[in-house]
Amino acid sequence: MTTWSSLGHTAKVLEERRDDYGDPAEQFRAIADRWSITLGTPITPSQVALCMIDLKLARLAYDPGHVDSIVDVIGYAALLREVR
């Protein structure tokens, strides 16, 4: 997959996720609220995105060519400004 096709595919996935789950800012806020309870410390929506990127990077260390994980890293990074 080329750089441009990866970006185009990621944009499509983000649109599909928005259709399936709604506004990313609301979803990341809801996740942050749940993680804050679970972890006993305040978590921000940006931290959720960064943690999800880190999870995907850990998986990519095992399989650097896994396309879904690459797309997810790009997608979470793209959402960082939106979910702040």
Segments from the language model and where they lie:
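Intrinsically disordered, low-complexity regulatory regions
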Residues: 1-84
